[in-house]
C-alpha cells in the first residue's frame, strides 16, 4: 500500500513554513495521541498519530525535506529515523513537543559544543598573598608558585596507554551528549558513559590515569599595583585549571591580604596613627615629629592640647588604585602620664597641683572646672 503524502498527512501545502508544520503536527498529535484515545479499539487514532509523527520527522528536518521534495518517499532513508516510526513507540510526541517548547524557551541545549562534544571552561583557582602596608602603598613585583597542567610525557596528552588507542564512545557516538525524554520534553544531557568527551579510553595511561595531563608547578610573575587594598583580587587570565575537550582554561585570582602594621591603620585611602606626647608638651605646646609612609613629618602642638585631639596631614595617606589623589594621615594625640617619678619630681608636681587648684576653673579646658561641677551637683 502506497504511503500517503506527508504534506497531506499534516494538512499543509508544500510551501508551508517550518512554523506551520510544527503547528499542524502539534494539533494532530494532541488529537490522536493514544493517551487521549484509550477507548479507540480500532487503533485508528494510533495509526494517524504514527503517520503524523513520521511526516513531521521528515518535514521538520531541512535535509530530509529537501530529499523528500525531490525524490518522494524513496529519497528518505528510514534508517535515519532509528528504525521507522513504530520503533520509538509514542516517544516522538515528546520529542516533537520538546523541539517546539525548546524554541519557545530559547532552544538551549546544554553547554557550548565543539565538534559535537561538550566543551567546558576550566575552573578558577585562588591564591592568597600577604604583603606589607608599605608594599601595598608603593606596589611591588613578586613571584609565586602555582599548579600547572602539562601534557603527559608518557601518552603525549592522549590519556591512552602507549600502544593503545582512544575509541569513540558507543553511547553518544562521539557527540558527548545524549537525548533524554522527560514527559513531553526532550532534554539534552551530558553522556554518562564518556562524561561529555565523546571518547573512551579502554586502557588508560598509568602515568596520568587517563587524564592526558600531569600536575606540575610553575613560577608566575605578579605585579602588585600601588594603592591596592586588603581583600582586593588580581586576575591572571588563563592560569586556572585546564578546560575540557578543548575548552578555555580558567583564571587565577590572587587575593591580597595586608599584614597588620605596628603604627598605622588603613581606612580606604586614609591612614590613622596614635601619637603619644608628654603632659608637659600637651600643656606648654611644642613641635613634634610623627611618622609617615614616606618618612617623618613635623606637627606643631599648641599649648593646652587635650588627649584625643586629632591632627590631619593632607596627602600623607595612600593613593588608591582608583584614586586621583592620595588620602590623608590622621594623627590621634594621646597624653602620657609619667611613671617612676623621683622625689624631686613628685615635689614639683605637688607644687604645681597646689598652684592649679588655687587657679580653679581658669586652668580647665572647660568653661566650668570639674570641681565646680561637683560643687554644683552636691549643692543642688
Curated annotation (Swiss-Prot):
GO terms for biological process: chaperone cofactor-dependent protein refolding; DNA replication; protein refolding; response to heat. One of its GO terms (cellular component) is cytoplasm. Zn(2+) 1 binds at residues 152, 155, 205, 208. Residues 35-48, 364-380 have a biased composition (Basic and acidic residues). Residues 24-34 have a biased composition (Basic residues). Residues 5-72 form the J domain. It is found in: Cytoplasm. CXXCXGXG motif repeats lie at residues 152-159, 169-176, 191-198, 205-212. Residues 1-48, 357-380 are annotated as: Disordered. GO terms for molecular function: ATP binding; heat shock protein binding; unfolded protein binding; zinc ion binding. It holds the Pfam family DnaJ. Keywords: Chaperone, Cytoplasm, DNA replication, Metal-binding, Repeat, Stress response, Zinc, Zinc-finger. Participates actively in the response to hyperosmotic and heat shock by preventing the aggregation of stress-denatured proteins and by disaggregating proteins, also in an autonomous, DnaK-independent fashion. Unfolded proteins bind initially to DnaJ; upon interaction with the DnaJ-bound protein, DnaK hydrolyzes its bound ATP, resulting in the formation of a stable complex. GrpE releases ADP from DnaK; ATP binding to DnaK triggers the release of the substrate protein, thus completing the reaction cycle. The J domain is necessary and sufficient to stimulate DnaK ATPase activity. Zinc center 1 plays an important role in the autonomous, DnaK-independent chaperone activity of DnaJ. Zinc center 2 is essential for interaction with DnaK and for DnaJ activity. This is Chaperone protein DnaJ. It comes from Polaromonas sp. (strain JS666 / ATCC BAA-500).
Amino acid at each position: 500500500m502506497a504511503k500517503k503524502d506527508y504534506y497531506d498527512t499534516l494538512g499543509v501545502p508544500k510551501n508551508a513554513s517550518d512554523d506551520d508544520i510544527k503547528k499542524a503536527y502539534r494539533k494532530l498529535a494532541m488529537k490522536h495521541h493514544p493517551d487521549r484515545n484509550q477507548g479507540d479499539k480500532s487503533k485508528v487514532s494510533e495509526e494517524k498519530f504514527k503517520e503524523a509523527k513520521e511526516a513531521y520527522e521528515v518535514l521538520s528536518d531541512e535535509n530530509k525535506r529537501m530529499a523528500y521534495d525531490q525524490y518522494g518517499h524513496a529519497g528518505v532513508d528510514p534508517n535515519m529515523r532509528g528504525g521507522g516510526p513504530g520503533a520509538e513507540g509514542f516517544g516522538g510526541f515528546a520529542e516533537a513537543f520538546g523541539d517546539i517548547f525548546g524554541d519557545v524557551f530559547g532552544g538551549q541545549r546544554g553547554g557550548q559544543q565543539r565538534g559535537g562534544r561538550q566543551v567546558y571552561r576550566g575552573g578558577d583557582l585562588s591564591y592568597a598573598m600577604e604583603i606589607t602596608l608599605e608594599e601595598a602603598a608603593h606596589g611591588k613585583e613578586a613571584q609565586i608558585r602555582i599548579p600547572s597542567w602539562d601534557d603527559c610525557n608518557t601518552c603525549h596528552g592522549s590519556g591512552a596507554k602507549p600502544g593503545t588507542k582512544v575509541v569513540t564512545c558507543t553511547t553518544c557516538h562521539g557527540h558527548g551528549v545524549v537525548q533524554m525524554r522527560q514527559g513531553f520534553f526532550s532534554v539534552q544531557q551530558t553522556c554518562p558513559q564518556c562524561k561529555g568527551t565523546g571518547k573512551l579510553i579502554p586502557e588508560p595511561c598509568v602515568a596520568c590515569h587517563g587524564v592526558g595531563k600531569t600536575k606540575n608547578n610553575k613560577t608566575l610573575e605578579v605585579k602588585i599595583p600601588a594603592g591596592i587594598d586588603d581583600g582586593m583580587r588580581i586576575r591572571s587570565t588563563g592560569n586556572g585549571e585546564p578546560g575540557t575537550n578543548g575548552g578555555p582554561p580558567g583564571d587565577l585570582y590572587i587575593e591580597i591580604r595586608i599584614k597588620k602594621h605596628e603604627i598605622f591603620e588603613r581606612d580606604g585611602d586614609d591612614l590613622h596613627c596614635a601619637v603619644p606626647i608628654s603632659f608637659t608638651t600637651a600643656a606648654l605646646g611644642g613641635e613634634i615629629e610623627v611618622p609617615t609612609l614616606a618618612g617623618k613629618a613635623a606637627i606643631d602642638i599648641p599649648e593646652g592640647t587635650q588627649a584625643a585631639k586629632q591632627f590631619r596631614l593632607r596627602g600623607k595617606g595612600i593613593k588608591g588604585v582608583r584614586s586621583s589623589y592620595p588620602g590623608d594621615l590622621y594623627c590621634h594625640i594621646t597624653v602620657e602620664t609619667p611613671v617612676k617619678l623621683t622625689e624631686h619630681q613628685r615635689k614639683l608636681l605637688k607644687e604645681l597641683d597646689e598652684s592649679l587648684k588655687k587657679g580653679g576653673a581658669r586652668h580647665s579646658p572647660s568653661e566650668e572646672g570639674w570641681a565646680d561641677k561637683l560643687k554644683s551637683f552636691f549643692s543642688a
